[in-house]
A protein has these predicted regions:
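N-terminal "domain-start" segment
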Residues: 1-75
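Generic structural motif recognizing short loop/turn segments at the entrances and edges of beta-strands
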Residues: 15-21, 36, 83-88, 115, ...
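Short, mixed-charge low-complexity intrinsically disordered segments
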Residues: 71-88
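Acidic, proline/glycine-rich low-complexity IDRs
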Residues: 86-135
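Generic detector of intrinsically disordered, low-complexity, polar/charged segments
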Residues: 56, 63, 79, 104-107, ...
């Protein structure tokens, strides 16, 4: 299992690549990573429900916002972290009550528009992928 320093280093390496495709990556350590996510981004509306996706990382990533955006990110994720134990995805389009809190001037991960949020659960930590744009 990775310690926090190793996890941050690998997550930073993955984030560098992912940001080229307008995707940010953040590691979370709490068992209840959704609460940690809400606290980290100061989201007050907590009614959003995560929708489970397919078990396949490549398939889940491709389903979110198109293969072009995710192919290289999926490969790098697998090489750095291996396959996750579980993947949870939700689309902001399906959760309009969260759009105002996740997007806009103080938007989530620096994106003005946020499209999808995905959590890849591993043993002892969770990677959060946020797909968005400033255009």
């Amino acid at each position: 299992m990775l310690d926090k320093e190793q996890l941050f280093d690998k997550a930073e390496e993955l984030d560098e690549l992912a940001m080229r495709y307008e995707v940010s990556v953040s590691p979370f350590f709490e068992k209840d990573y959704l609460t940690e996510f809400y606290n980290f981004y100061e989201i007050r509306n907590r009614k959003a429900k995560l929708i489970p996706s397919e078990e396949d990382l490549d398939g889940s990533l491709r389903d979110l916002s198109g293969e072009y955006r995710w192919k290289e990110i999926a490969e790098k994720t697998k090489s750095l972290f291996g396959l996750p134990e579980r993947i949870m995805v939700f689309s902001i389009d399906d959760l309009p009550h969260l759009k105002d809190e996740l997007g806009g001037r103080r938007g989530c991960s620096g994106f003005f528009f946020v499209f999808d949020v995905m959590f890849c659960e591993y043993d002892g930590y969770t990677l959060c992928f946020i797909c968005g744009t400033n255009n």
